[in-house]
Each structure stands twice: as C-alpha cells, then as structure tokens.
A protein has these predicted regions:
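Key DNA-contact positions within bacterial/archaeal DNA-binding proteins
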Residues: 42
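Short, Lys/Arg-enriched N-terminal segment that forms or immediately precedes the first helix
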Residues: 1-9
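Conserved segment of winged-helix/HTH DNA-binding domains
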Residues: 65-87
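Short capping segments at the starts of secondary-structure elements
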Residues: 14, 25-32
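Alpha-helical residues within the helix-turn-helix
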Residues: 35, 52-53
Length: 87
C-alpha cells in the first residue's frame, strides 16, 4: 500500500481524481475514460500507470469477441478514505 504522502501526491492531480470517480462506479477502458474526461487516451494511460503503481487501480485483460489482442479494462483495486482534521 502507498503511504499517505505518496497517496496525496497521486491524488493532487485532478485528472486522476476524475478517473477514480468513474472507476468507483464501474470498470472502464482507457478510451472510455478519455472521452468522458476530455483528455487524450495517451494522457489517460499515463495517469492509469501512476494509479496502478500506487495500487489504486488494477488492470484486467479482456478477450475481444471478434478476435484480435485482448483489451485492458481498469477498476478500483481498494477502497480509500482520507479524513483530515485541521485545528
């Protein structure tokens, strides 16, 4: 598991938070995330790699119905709750 400082550094990025918001609801393909968030698929892949390294998301290989190489679909790996009290 990622320590608190690493988790906060990962979550400070708005695009990563938007990705997680969608993955909490249901697994998504990178192209779906790119279309919903309004950033390139390449940028989504960069953020997914960071989220995967931080153990926020997991990648699953899904076979295609009509042949071809399998596709990757991403889902939230674990629940996370951060509560910060000031004062």
């Amino acid at each position: 598991m990622t320590d608190l400082d690493e988790a906060l550094a990962i979550l400070q990025n708005k695009a990563r938070r938007q990705i997680l918001e969608r993955l909490v609801r249901e697994p998504h393909y990178p192209l779906q995330l790119a279309e919903q968030i309004g950033i390139s698929q390449q940028a989504v892949m960069k953020h997914l790699r960071i989220l995967e390294k931080g153990e926020f998301v997991a990648k699953m290989r899904v076979a295609r119905n009509k042949g071809g190489p399998p596709k990757n679909i991403y889902s939230v790996q674990q629940a996370l709750s951060i509560r910060i009290e000031l004062g």
